[in-house]
Amino acid sequence: IYYGLLFIQYLQFVNQEISIVFHLIRSKFMGTNNQETKTFRAGDIIYSHNDPAEFIFLIHSGKVRIESKHGLELGILETGEIFGEVGHIIETPRTVTAVAVTNSIIRIIDEKTVKEKMNKADPVLAAIVRGLSLRIGDANALAEKHWLELNVYKSLKK
């Protein structure tokens, strides 16, 4: 169990480190016009696992928890951070659920804006972003798999 928990903590750390790259990218979207802003109360679900990935979100204020489909916390994001990019960039439905931890104001970045920014980006940078997005999805799935296995093991010990 100890090594399983360490592995999950490691995957959560990797996920946070990869999000630093997306934090740097957020500056590209900060000055974008025509962004809708939406307010969420603490506990509100912003999007759920398997929802269509039509938008990317930028936290203007507040905190957002990212969790796996079975409720494993994958990270807490704060003001200035982007989320929802993975499914959008790799063109798959949402692989996680996003929940407002505190009352939050979220800027919604539409698909057209994202495509314009990505098309203007250096092709190498665009490839790096896509590769990191794939790795985040894989790391999240692996963390959840091990978390579920640990829960089964714990239930057998009782």
Can you name each region flagged by the protein language model?
Residues F22-E67:
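Regulatory nucleotide-sensing modules
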Residues I46, E73-L74:
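Local beta-strand/beta-hairpin segments that build beta-sheet-rich folds
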Residues I76-V129:
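Cyclic-nucleotide recognition modules
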Residues D51, I59, K69, E91, ...:
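A short, compositionally biased micro-patch
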Residues V114-Y153:
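A small-molecule sensor/coupling module
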Residues G43, G62, G80, A98, ...:
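Short hydrophobic/aromatic patches on the structural cores and recognition surfaces of FHA
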